UniProtKB/Swiss-Prot annotation:
Task of the protein: Involved in phosphonate degradation.
EC assignment: 2.6.1.37
InterPro entries: Aminotrans_V_dom, NH2EtPonate_pyrv_transaminase, PyrdxlP-dep_Trfase, PyrdxlP-dep_Trfase_major, PyrdxlP-dep_Trfase_small, SP_NH2Trfase/AEP_transaminase
GO-annotated biological processes: organic phosphonate catabolic process
Reactions performed catalytically: (2-aminoethyl)phosphonate + pyruvate = phosphonoacetaldehyde + L-alanine
Family: Belongs to the class-V pyridoxal-phosphate-dependent aminotransferase family. PhnW subfamily.
A Gene Ontology molecular function term of the record: 2-aminoethylphosphonate-pyruvate transaminase activity
Protein name from the UniProt record: 2-aminoethylphosphonate--pyruvate transaminase
Coiled coil: none
Assembly mode: Homodimer.
UniProt organism field: Hahella chejuensis (strain KCTC 2396)
Cofactor: pyridoxal 5'-phosphate
Amino acid sequence: MNQPNYYLLTPGPITTSRTVKEAMLNDWGSWDQDFNQVTQTVRDKLLAVANSQDTHVCVPLQGSGTFAVEATLGTLLGPQDKLLVLMNGAYGQRIANICDYLKRPYVCIDTGDYLPPDPNAVAELLRQDASITTVAVVHCETSSGILNPVEAIAEVVNGAGRKLIIDSMSAFGALPADAKKLGYAALISSANKCFEGVPGFGFALIRRDLLEQAKGNAHSLSMDLHDQWAYMEKTGQWRYTPPTHTVAAFAQALREYEEEGDAPARLARYTRNRDQLVAGMRQLGFQTLLEERWLSPVIVTFLSPADPNFDFKRFYQELKQRGFVIYPGKLTQTESFRIGCIGKIDTPEVARLLQAVKDTLIAMEISLS
């Protein structure tokens, strides 16, 4: 099958470089010392990106990013814990859903699809409910594209003597996530987002002292991050068959990440992409879901036009025929679609996308001006 190579303008999987793809051409023995060294290099680099080498450990886990979120919650939350979930989209809702499966007690602050959580409301609830031990927040809620104020939330949570878990799936690697400044108990992300690797594993950066205390908490053998970490520390190996090709590709992606200039350079490129995308789409007549101040450099949600000729399925296929894959909306109340700003793309690709959108509107006989 000769599959066309599209630009993936999504929050992950994303467009990867040819050299990242080529890194998957070799086979690796899962217990071989060479592969163990690749794993250790990856773990060390991720800790360095978060400025957390002295306080945290990196525990990779096979599967999607949600696997890593569930594993972290299941490992760190004991029966005596109660979680406050800050919810403003699908991924905050997913954390609550995981807690339902885990049978861990939780409460929510839900601010809907359009607004970030209010740190003052968080502080007030923590004052009122002494049984809350931990707070979970999504760094970038990609169902809307909103960037949540993790710095202000971290200050409130740490000031109240509670623990903070950050789902930084679509932000870590570009947005600041300094462990010393934010003081989080755990930060979770995956290979196929801002580091521009391919899907196959997620990872958690967890405070060493908390992980050491978490032995026996886990609800699942394969998702026991304490056991995964202890086994890696002892043997250098993954407990069960690792995604060898994905790890090798991620190691190459990390080399390219360093060559580009690490997080500041990546954030600058994604921000350029976002600014050009938003300006161009507005010029074509589209409106963003969010106010300017809440727009993230990861993904932007646009409102579907009211024109009766607009049909998202056709819009999607027309763009796909022109080489671009976008995302449908994930909102409950509003018809929308999403376009990502991350991956191995820069302003020339964004310009080509905008021309493709313009051509698609003409083909669909839609006028937004």
